[in-house]
Amino acid sequence: RNAEMQREIMINEITNVTGEVFMGMGVGCAQCHDHKFDPILQKDYFALQAFLSSVYWPDDRYHATEEEISKYEKDSRTWDETTEGIRDEMKSLLEAGARKTYEFRVKTFPPEVQVMFRKPWEEKSAYERQISFLVERQAEREVRTLATAEKILKKGSAELQRYGELKEEMAFFENLKPEDLPKAFVSTDTGREGAVVRMKEEEVSPGFLELLGGEVPEIEVREGTSGRRSALAEWLVRGDHPTTARVMVNRIWQHHFGKGIAASPNDFGMLGEEPSHPELLDWLAGEFVKGGWKMKRMHRLIMTSAAYRQTARFEPSNVHEVIDPENKWLWRFSPKRLSAEQIRDAMLAVSGELRHRDGGAAQTSAVPVRSIYVKKMR
């Protein structure tokens, strides 16, 4: 029931992942104290977190075209109008019990969280909106699980019998209900106001890491958003940013060779491994930026290189095997394991069952399309 702690864990995780994925820095070590090995200050951690603290995840956005959404909404309205009488009667039979269950669940949260939740939306701060979002999702999920007819209505009652009749009638219309559009997993801000981040009770403003310049960000507040995440994103993809491009091309290299030029892709600091070919890493990063940060271009550049097209044949008598048995200097191509998705696609291809397609909606793994089109729940 600790919605505040849940929110804290989520924001900390986002901050840590942002540092590792885009900057190659284990910033999480600076959450409780200054980093013991890298020059990352604790105040830098919370300044980075201040960019991300207002995020929340709406669940009402569709991953579909305007035409698909328009047709879906039209068909849904027709279905709603047709079944309105049945649904209203079913709802009225359960309403008192459902409302009681909902209120009971809300009351299990700490008193200060209940106060935040019951405030009018326009009076809530960004932090209070995030907490309310978490409380509402938990309470609604438990109502769906607990507030069933069998648990609310008295056994053998006329109300339970009537509900069963309505349920049978509704089953016919369920088959006619428009198929739900796929939901888009998106994040947005709670509003124009940024959520307050504190370090030892002191409010911390968004700021870039001292290690990487420590300049004061220019944040443009726009309608419905604090503008903080946009400011962070624009800083990360600046051409002169010292880490982002290097970290990204290192990940692409790792995808193709099984091991990055820097073998610790999430940590370019003192605890990570030094790049085996630092000049190559710098050059690839420069090409990545010059090419407009286009990943397809970088994939093509690496896959057409002499290093990638080398043989993987193992010859024990080769002098290179004696000098560099780990192939650190890339004198041959190191075999690497295929991913589960690559194995799946290969099996479908050799069996002749693979369906070739370009684009379209995501599918379940049971549909024989390439794995790039298969939903992956995280």
Regions found by a protein language model. Name each.
Residues 8-11, 39, 78-90, 125-378:
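Primarily short, surface-exposed interaction patches in extracytoplasmic proteins
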